[in-house]
Swiss-Prot record:
The lineage of its organism: Bacteria, Pseudomonadati, Pseudomonadota, Gammaproteobacteria, Enterobacterales. One of its GO terms (biological process) is L-methionine salvage from S-adenosylmethionine. It catalyses: 1,2-dihydroxy-5-(methylsulfanyl)pent-1-en-3-one + O2 = 3-(methylsulfanyl)propanoate + CO + formate + 2 H(+); 1,2-dihydroxy-5-(methylsulfanyl)pent-1-en-3-one + O2 = 4-methylsulfanyl-2-oxobutanoate + formate + 2 H(+). Belongs to the acireductone dioxygenase (ARD) family. GO terms for molecular function: acireductone dioxygenase (Ni2+-requiring) activity; acireductone dioxygenase [iron(II)-requiring] activity; iron ion binding; nickel cation binding. Monomer. This is Acireductone dioxygenase. Fe(2+) binds at residues 97, 99, 103, 141. It comes from Yersinia pseudotuberculosis serotype O:3 (strain YPIII). The record marks 102 as: May play a role in transmitting local conformational changes. Catalyzes 2 different reactions between oxygen and the acireductone 1,2-dihydroxy-3-keto-5-methylthiopentene (DHK-MTPene) depending upon the metal bound in the active site. Fe-containing acireductone dioxygenase (Fe-ARD) produces formate and 2-keto-4-methylthiobutyrate (KMTB), the alpha-ketoacid precursor of methionine in the methionine recycle pathway. Ni-containing acireductone dioxygenase (Ni-ARD) produces methylthiopropionate, carbon monoxide and formate, and does not lie on the methionine recycle pathway.
Amino acid sequence: MSGLTIFSDQQPEKPLWQSHDAEEIQQQLTAIGVRFERWQADCELGENPQPEAVIAAYQHEIDRLVAENGYKSWDVISMRPDNPQREALREKFLSEHTHGEDEVRFFVEGSGLFCLHLNEKVYQILCEKNDLLSVPADIPHWFDMGSAPNFTAIRVFDNPEGWIARSTGDNIADGYPRLA
């Protein structure tokens, strides 16, 4: 079940607000300029989905995002618990960073934890299957895929080469709850 937990950026041990209600999550995130929607990810992809099959299955949704926002490219990220690079990739995404473009993800399988740092707060968004999340450019954030990652998400980009992360140098992510 999708969820949102909001913390002060000074007190990671004490949540200020928490919900698993999609409408409440959407209201909180819309207030800070972040798009959160529940779409339908109802295509069976199998155990190890190939990127081409995922894109073909959800081309209509990709076309919708491109038409709405002018995105230029897209790809698929799929991570499984047996991926030999999972620990290194998890560490890479756990560092707070920004992008010069929106970070758009449509989860078609599994889950991941997006953490946004703005307005002296940390917003932890547990994204699950059917969740579309669009984080505007330049918002500091990090992503936790967990120690046994299991998700497939479509990523949509402004830049045809994909996103380029810029580290903030802040170690704030180290103090907040992570996925198991």
